[in-house]
Amino acid sequence: MVKLRLKRYGRKGQVTYRIVAMNNLSRRDGKAIEELGFYNPRTNESSLNIANIKRRIEQGAQPTNTVRYILAKANIL
C-alpha cells in the first residue's frame, strides 16, 4: 500500500521534512516513489505539488495523520 508520509531531512535541531509517496513497509528515510513537497515545522512553512498529491490520492494512496493535517491546512482534503 502506498502512503503519503514525511521523510526527515536537515540536521539535529533544525529538522525539515519532505512529503513523499512511499510503500508503507519502507523505512522512514528509505527510497521514495515520488517527492510531493516539503514541510518545515519550525516556521510552519510548506510547499506542495497539489496536482501530484491529488493524483496519488485518487490512485489510492493513504496520507498519514500528520500529512492529512498539512493537506487539510492547505485546503487539499
From Swiss-Prot:
Molecular function terms, GO-annotated: structural constituent of ribosome
InterPro entries: Ribosomal_bS16 (IPR000307), Ribosomal_bS16_CS (IPR020592), Ribosomal_bS16_dom_sf (IPR023803)
Family of the protein in this entry: Belongs to the bacterial ribosomal protein bS16 family.
One term under GO cellular component: cyanelle
Organism: Cyanophora paradoxa
Location in or out of the cell: Plastid, Cyanelle
Top-level taxon of the source organism: Eukaryota
Pfam family, one: Ribosomal_S16
Biological process according to GO: mitochondrial translation
PROSITE patterns: RIBOSOMAL_S16
Listed name of the protein: Small ribosomal subunit protein bS16c
UniProt keyword list: Cyanelle, Plastid, Ribonucleoprotein, Ribosomal protein
Keyword Ribosomal protein: yes
